[in-house]
Amino acid sequence: MDKESYDYLVKIVLAGPSGTGKSCLLQRFVKNQWDDQVSHTVGIDFASRIISVGMGNQQKRIKLQIWDTAGQEKFRSVARNYYRGAAGAVLVYDVTNKDSFEELSSWLSDIRAMAPSTICVVLAGSKSDLQNQRQVSTEEAAEFCSEKHISSAHETSSYTGSNVEECFLSVVSTIITRIELGEIDPQDQSLGIQYGDLSFRRPVHPSSTSNWWTSITNWDDLVRLERQTRSYCC
């Protein structure tokens, strides 16, 4: 089997206030690297990775296309455009910064206003290795998830790698389960999922005219995003 083959292509967005570590989270997940000499994302950044979920004959290969949105207020209107057609979102706050946690409701409102109603959202508390600087408890995060109907909460460390894989796997596993239950239709590309070359491909329904690439002007833009030198923020 071609190592680049996959069953599904899934669009995920990273969202949250500036400086919470979204880009470092992406760098750790995609490249398994840590770099503390990084800068804030300007506008939008992009990366991809293929992962496997499930066991045995039920195992699926999923290609994640992950969009890292800028947290600065001046780029927020740009970030909102990329929530359209997202199958999943990782909402990031900094466990050492209470203000970043208190801003989450606003970011979540943006996601749910712009993304499909089927979007799966998980909460990621970054910088969990800085326990002596903690300002947000795990109980507060769990309560927020319960109140806002977020599927799960994860405390992550891009520095150590702790829980980074688990965070993204949680999003993907939930999405795949919902596909198998018939709650999400991969033929409807507006939901942020497409069949890959390992899946049984059925004709796309004529009514599925929406496309989750609508936030990109054309394929040249996508190639440019993939080739550009990426800047990451911790």
Swiss-Prot record:
Gene Ontology molecular function terms on file: GTP binding; GTPase activity
UniProt keyword terms in alphabetical order: Cell membrane, GTP-binding, Lipoprotein, Membrane, Nucleotide-binding, Prenylation, Protein transport, Transport
A GO CC annotation given for this chain: plasma membrane
Localisation per UniProt entry: Cell membrane
UniProt protein name: GTP-binding protein ypt4
Record GO biological process: exocytosis; protein transport; regulation of intracellular protein transport; regulation of vesicle-mediated transport; signaling; vacuole organization
Protein's membrane topology: Lipid-anchor
Family: Belongs to the small GTPase superfamily. Rab family.
Xref: Pfam families: Ras
Domain of life assignment: Eukaryota
Name of encoding gene: ypt4
Motif Effector region: where in chain: 39-47
Annotated signal sequence range: none
Residues binding GTP: G16, P17, S18, G19, T20, G21, K22, S23, D68, T69, A70, G71, Q72
Taxonomic lineage from the root: Eukaryota, Fungi, Dikarya, Ascomycota, Taphrinomycotina
Main localization category: membrane
Claim: Transport is one of the keywords in the record: yes
InterPro entries: P-loop_NTPase, Rab_GTPases_membrane_traffic, Small_GTP-bd, Small_GTPase
NCBIfam families membership: small_GTP
Lipidation (S-geranylgeranyl cysteine): C233, C234
